[in-house]
């Protein structure tokens, strides 16, 4: 379709892919950073934001694969539970010297984490999925409404996860403290400007500088929805989704991280560009935007990581 729709797909696809690259890190200020991005597409009603659904398809096969793994864990847990109850009965009758160990609860494995959920549920899903997850929501106020609720306000989780800072919570069902040492969360949202303001009311909000935004202008002409030459998105994306699943699994099985590096020339260009941008922002807009430029640099570095591993994967 048009250039704007292709750009929209590119932005949202980068967001989805950024959440599908586990065990892949780069060194940034001495810390290991992953590829995770927060993206928000802003546009009026009916301007074509629905194209985001194609980007979500890139992770759909991986998501379904995770759900199948969860079903297998649940079936295994049921079998182990039967065995545990039998051994417990024998122990209670004095026929076993040691009490049996109760099997751990099955994990809720998935790639996509629902936005309309509680803070504790989000942290639990991250913990059960090795800290990884993607929040993908085409109506931005779904997340905004949850963040306004006391039980659903996980804004602090989003802010910490952007930098992979540890998060912790108390699991009442097992009466235990749970830590997620390195959350790696990606977020892809779309909505109108009013919906954006519900989520991020001002630049002072900590989420503002963590998101990359794409402004969708829309198209004045009415497109023919019956065009027979229209591209078969479904077939192409199904093939791509399978490739991304294979890449996701290959990285998941690694015992150590795959590393990303910039060479000396690239490092110099990177530092020079953002130093100039920071000076320009301070003199032209406001010194209060310093943090936004710093995080913009992190996003740029992460996009470079994504593009590099995709090229590497295709070549190898």
What is the predicted function of each stretch?
Residues 1-316:
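Phosphate-handling catalytic cores of nucleic-acid transaction enzymes
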């Amino acid at each position: 379709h048009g250039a704007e729709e292709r750009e929209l797909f590119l932005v949202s696809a980068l967001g989805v892919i950024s959440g599908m690259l586990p065990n892949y890190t780069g060194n940034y200020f001495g810390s290991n950073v992953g590829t995770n991005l927060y993206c928000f597409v802003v546009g009026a009603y009916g301007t074509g934001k629905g194209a985001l659904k194609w980007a979500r398809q890139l992770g759909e096969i991986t998501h379904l694969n995770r759900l199948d793994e969860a079903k297998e864990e649940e079936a295994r847990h049921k079998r182990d539970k039967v065995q545990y109850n039998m051994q417990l009965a024998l122990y209670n009758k004095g026929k076993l010297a040691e009490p049996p160990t109760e099997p751990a609860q099955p994990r809720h494995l998935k790639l996509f984490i629902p936005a309309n959920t509680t803070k504790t549920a989000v942290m639990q899903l991250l913990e059960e999925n090795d800290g990884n997850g993607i929040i993908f929501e085409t109506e931005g106020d779904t997340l905004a409404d949850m963040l306004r609720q006391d039980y659903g306000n996980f804004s602090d989780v989003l802010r910490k996860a952007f930098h992979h800072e540890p998060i912790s919570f108390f699991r009442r069902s097992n009466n235990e403290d749970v830590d997620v040492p390195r959350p790696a969360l990606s977020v892809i949202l779309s909505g109108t400007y009013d919906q954006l303001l519900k989520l991020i009311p001002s630049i002072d909000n900590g989420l503002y500088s963590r998101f990359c935004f794409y402004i969708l202008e829309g198209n004045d002409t009415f497109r023919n929805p019956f065009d027979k030459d229209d591209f078969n998105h479904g077939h192409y994306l199904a093939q791509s989704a399978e490739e991304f699943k294979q890449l996701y699994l290959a990285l998941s099985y690694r015992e150590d991280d795959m590393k990303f590096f910039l060479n000396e020339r690239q490092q110099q260009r990177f530092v020079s560009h953002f130093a100039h941008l920071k000076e320009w922002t301070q003199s032209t807009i406001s010194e209060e935007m310093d943090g936004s430029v710093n995080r913009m640099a992190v996003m740029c570095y992460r996009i470079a990581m994504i593009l590099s591993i995709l090229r590497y994967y295709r070549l190898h």
